[in-house]
């Protein structure tokens, strides 16, 4: 494991405070990363408390295994949090978890390590997989997908305005030479993007789209939210930190639907009577953002949005 890359945990105190940790509770960290949130949770648990960590990244798993060797209250598994339903079932924890934390997106060590292939800033192999042993790499996707599919990924997941133009440039270039390096792809995307945003690399959105697609991030999020609700006990808390509008929209709509129902979207004078909506969760407060002090110390926290819900039934 390369220890030269550090990670500053975003909304550390705020997220753990939102969990309302009980000393004897059972908690789940769905995105262990480098263990910032997990360590703070463990510091608030008593001898009977338990914490289960999830991560797909082998470097995160190595860090988690070292922590598990130090603290018997902690266990880590190499799975996506989308699979927390089956994991909690297997461990007899379904409906018994006191709180679940999901800190979404890519970590600083993943972005900063060129060998992981996440960043256009540092040249490396074009991979982008959280778990390099599973699924296809970004290079494999770019090499085989039709232009229409590449454009869809750039537009739908990267919110890239010039997705079609950039995808066509990628396909034209791959017919001459395949893409193997991040800098190579970034250069082609840069040339194909006719309208650069001030202060933003023109490959940013396309790279985000690729990463989300390769790791099925939005699909995992939707599955993980549903599984989290089933895993929680009544009164248990769900805390989610997202880093871009696509993630936050999914979290916001999921919580709103379970807290308020869909009655507001129905016509007022329907000839049938609907059963009164019974909320499944209560939303705690408004969306929370990193403080000015935190964003100054850690610029990557600027886009963080935290939402909190409590299971009612």
UniProtKB/Swiss-Prot annotation:
MF terms from GO for this chain are: rRNA (cytosine-N4-)-methyltransferase activity
Q: Which GO terms describe its biological process?
A: rRNA base methylation
What is the main EC category here? transferase
Please give the Pfam families that the UniProt record associates with this protein.
Answer: Methyltransf_5
Q: Where in the cell is it found?
A: Cytoplasm
Protein residues bound to S-adenosyl-L-methionine: 35-37, 55, 81, 103, 110
Per UniProt, which keywords does this protein have?
Cytoplasm, Methyltransferase, rRNA processing, S-adenosyl-L-methionine, Transferase
Query: PANTHER family annotated for this entry?
Result: 12S RRNA N4-METHYLCYTIDINE METHYLTRANSFERASE, S-ADENOSYL-METHYLTRANSFERASE MRAW
Main role? Specifically methylates the N4 position of cytidine in position 1402 (C1402) of 16S rRNA.
The record's family statement is:
Belongs to the methyltransferase superfamily. RsmH family.
> What is this protein's record name?
Ribosomal RNA small subunit methyltransferase H
**Where does this protein come from, organism-wise?**
Pseudomonas syringae pv. syringae (strain B728a)
